[in-house]
Each structure stands twice: as structure tokens, then as C-alpha cells.
């Protein structure tokens, strides 16, 4: 078993992608860094390229062991779902290009792991992230969701170890 593990949680979006780095060492979770990427560029393809570059910079800077990525949920319309799926593909590609394994989690699974219900509001998730990490949540909602994904994954890893499955 590794002495510590570092996970990047990512909440993909075409307008804003939240990310958060959480490290677990000896059962203690620590916030390393977090932020939000607002891609720049004239057209959608340029924004996707900027998202890739910015996220790749984060991955290179923090060298996470694994990535927990929020899966695409149902969007209000097909065009929105397609754009979200493309942004998510860019996120997965940026991680894979740097050798970081990607684990997907449905939003309801992440919410249930942090709040106890899969229908929790973003504010509730952000509050619980702050409680778990022992910090005051002063980040964007997308960043809180990304940190929640990282915490959810670290909890899943711990449960797998305790069950003797890893």
C-alpha cells in the first residue's frame, strides 16, 4: 500500500471546469490545491483546446496518481449534452496523455458519498467538502463538486482496501 495517494477530482464543463487536488496520507485527507478553468477562445474548438492546455498544466504541476471525473448527467437539451460530452472527453484525454488513470463517478454517487443523498444541492456538497477537509469553502461551486469527486474516490479506495479487495 502506498504511503500516500494524490487524486485530482474534475467536474467537466464547456464553460467552467472545476478541479481539486486531495491527498490522503495515513487516512487523513488534505486539500492540496483547487481551482476552475474558464476556457478562452473564439469558437468552441478553440475553447476545448484551451481547456486541454490548462488542465494538462494542472496535471503536470501536481502529478496526481489518479483522477476522479464526474460523469455526464442528463442535460436539458441534446446540444448541451454533446458539448458537455466533448468537454469531458478533453478532460479524460488530458489525464490519459499524462498517464493518470481516470475513474468515473455519477453525480448522484458523489453527492450520496458526501451528503448522504444523491439529490443534494451544490451548496450542501460544498459545505460537506469543507467539513471533510477542515477548510472554509470559498471556492466556486464547480470546484466544490470536483473536490467532492476526489473525496468520493478516496473513500471508495479506502472501503475497497478494508474489504480486502485491493
Curated annotation (Swiss-Prot):
Example of a GO biological process term: DNA repair
Annotated active site: 11, 70, 142
GO-annotated molecular function: crossover junction DNA endonuclease activity; DNA binding; magnesium ion binding
Catalytic activity line of the entry: Endonucleolytic cleavage at a junction such as a reciprocal single-stranded crossover between two homologous DNA duplexes (Holliday junction)
Residues reported to bind Mg(2+) 2: 70
The protein's required cofactors: Mg(2+)
Compartments it resides in: Cytoplasm
InterPro entries referenced in this protein's UniProt entry, alphabetically: RNaseH-like_sf, RNaseH_sf, X-over_junc_endoDNase_RuvC
Keywords, in A-Z order: Cytoplasm, DNA damage, DNA recombination, DNA repair, DNA-binding, Endonuclease, Hydrolase, Magnesium, Metal-binding, Nuclease
This enzyme's EC code(s): 3.1.21.10
Binding-site positions, Mg(2+) 1: 11, 142
Cofactor detail note: Binds 2 Mg(2+) ion per subunit.
GO CC entries: cytoplasm; Holliday junction resolvase complex
Record NCBIfam families: ruvC
Subunit and partners: Homodimer which binds Holliday junction (HJ) DNA. The HJ becomes 2-fold symmetrical on binding to RuvC with unstacked arms; it has a different conformation from HJ DNA in complex with RuvA. In the full resolvosome a probable DNA-RuvA(4)-RuvB(12)-RuvC(2) complex forms which resolves the HJ.
Similarity section: Belongs to the RuvC family.
Functional description taken from the UniProt entry: The RuvA-RuvB-RuvC complex processes Holliday junction (HJ) DNA during genetic recombination and DNA repair. Endonuclease that resolves HJ intermediates. Cleaves cruciform DNA by making single-stranded nicks across the HJ at symmetrical positions within the homologous arms, yielding a 5'-phosphate and a 3'-hydroxyl group; requires a central core of homology in the junction. The consensus cleavage sequence is 5'-(A/T)TT(C/G)-3'. Cleavage occurs on the 3'-side of the TT dinucleotide at the point of strand exchange.
Name of the protein described by the UniProt record: Crossover junction endodeoxyribonuclease RuvC
Protein source organism: Nitratidesulfovibrio vulgaris (strain ATCC 29579 / DSM 644 / CCUG 34227 / NCIMB 8303 / VKM B-1760 / Hildenborough)
Lineage, broadest ranks: Bacteria, Pseudomonadati, Thermodesulfobacteriota, Desulfovibrionia, Desulfovibrionales
Amino acid at each position: 500500500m502506498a504511503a500516500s495517494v494524490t487524486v485530482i477530482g474534475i467536474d467537466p464543463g464547456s464553460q467552467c471546469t472545476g478541479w481539486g487536488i486531495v491527498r490522503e496520507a495515513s487516512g487523513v485527507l488534505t486539500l492540496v490545491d483547487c481551482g476552475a478553468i474558464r476556457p478562452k477562445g473564439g469558437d468552441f474548438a478553440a475553447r476545448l483546446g484551451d481547456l486541454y492546455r490548462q488542465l494538462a498544466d494542472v496535471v503536470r504541476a501536481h502529478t496526481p496518481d489518479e483522477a476522479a471525473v464526474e460523469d455526464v448527467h442528463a442535460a436539458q437539451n441534446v446540444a448541451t449534452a454533446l458539448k458537455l460530452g466533448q468537454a469531458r472527453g478533453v478532460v479524460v484525454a488530458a489525464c490519459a496523455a499524462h498517464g493518470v488513470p481516470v475513474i468515473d463517478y455519477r453525480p448522484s454517487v458523489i453527492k450520496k458519498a458526501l451528503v448522504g443523498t444523491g439529490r443534494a444541492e451544490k451548496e450542501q456538497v460544498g459545505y460537506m467538502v469543507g467539513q471533510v477537509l477542515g477548510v472554509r469553502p470559498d471556492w466556486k461551486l464547480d470546484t466544490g463538486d470536483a473536490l467532492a469527486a476526489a473525496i468520493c474516490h478516496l473513500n471508495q479506495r479506502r472501503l475497497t482496501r478494508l474489504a480486502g479487495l485491493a
